[in-house]
From Swiss-Prot:
SUPFAM superfamilies: YebC-like (SSF75625). It is found in: Cytoplasm. Transmembrane segments: none annotated. One of its GO terms (cellular component) is cytosol. Belongs to the TACO1 family. InterPro entries: Integrase-like_N, TACO1_YebC-like_2nd/3rd_dom, TACO1_YebC_N, Transcrip_reg_TACO1-like, Transcrip_reg_TACO1-like_dom3, YebC-like. Keywords: Cytoplasm, DNA-binding, Transcription, Transcription regulation. It comes from Thermosipho africanus (strain TCF52B). HAMAP family: Transcrip_reg_TACO1 (MF_00693). GO terms for molecular function: DNA binding. The lineage of its organism: Bacteria, Thermotogati, Thermotogota, Thermotogae, Thermotogales. This is Probable transcriptional regulatory protein THA_1246. Its main location: cytoplasm. GO terms for biological process: regulation of DNA-templated transcription.
Length: 252
């Protein structure tokens, strides 16, 4: 599954490069509002809020923007009521897409996604037809240079409750969703600070190459550029070299 992990890492790198762009802030603000609405405004008692605040600070979001977003979520300030919605879809070559959105208008979002999918060779799928292909997991990403002794790191991660460790850059620690905060904190106590989030990992992947690979990546890219879309999960597999070439072309 290295081609899939490489794609996730390229997206991670691109997000870091794009951190000052307003689109990244727009998505993070929505996440903060929804997390605060769901679990309250105190990150000490709201793991979901704590995780998104760490990402917001890493993206250099102003403190004032963060505080206002939290207050909009808790109701202390007036704000937009966002709903979390999953859209299931197919890309070219039978690749499954699990699209996580936050929207204040479900009809608008569905219409926009239907248009983007149709334009790029994809289609919306019936509810439940794609969900079973993905597994909800926690993931902690730690830059490789922060880990001097991988064996020591792996022992700490496994003892803390990690299910799997993917030796890439960044190093990825996979956990059960309800163990994410506990494992992250245990790693941090031992000097291994990382960024944590809940994600959806494909159970199996579909190998795509050539024109199909380019079409799939282009579709995922335009979907993620939509303001209502927070994340697109996909079950494709593309060779690392080809993936890098296509992503460079799309980014250029």
């Amino acid at each position: 599954m290295s081609g899939h992990n490489k794609w996730a890492n390229i997206k991670h790198r691109k997000a870091a490069q794009d951190a000052k762009k307003s689109k990244i802030f727009t998505k993070l603000i929505r996440e903060i509002i929804v997390a605060a609405k769901e679990g309250g405004g105190d990150p000490e008692t709201n793991p979901r809020l704590r995780a998104v605040l760490e990402r917001a600070r890493a993206a250099n979001m102003p403190k004032d923007t963060i505080e206002k977003s939290i207050k909009k979520g808790t109701g202390e300030l007036e704000g937009v009521d966002y709903q979390e919605i999953i859209y299931e879809a197919y890309a070219p070559a039978g690749v499954a897409l699990y699209i996580y959105a936050m929207t204040d208008n479900k009809n608008r979002t569905a219409q926009e996604l239907r248009h983007l999918l149709s334009k790029h060779g994809g289609s919306l799928a019936e509810s439940g037809s794609v969900a079973w292909l993905f597994e909800r997991k926690g993931i902690i990403e730690i830059p490789k240079e922060k880990i001097a002794d991988f064996e020591e790191f792996a022992m700490v991660a496994i003892d803390a409750g990690a299910e799997d460790i993917i030796e890439d850059d960044p190093i990825q620690v996979i956990t059960a969703p309800d163990m994410l905060t506990e494992v992250k904190d245990k790693l941090a106590e031992n000097g291994f600070e990382g960024e944590a989030k809940v994600t959806f990992i494909p159970k199996n992947t579909v190998k795509v190459t050539g024109a199909d690979a380019e079409k799939v990546l282009k579709l995922v890219s335009v979907l993620e550029d939509n303001d209502d879309v927070q994340e697109v999960y996909a079950n494709f597999e593309i060779d690392d070299k080809e993936l890098e070439e296509i992503m460079s072309k799309l980014e250029g």
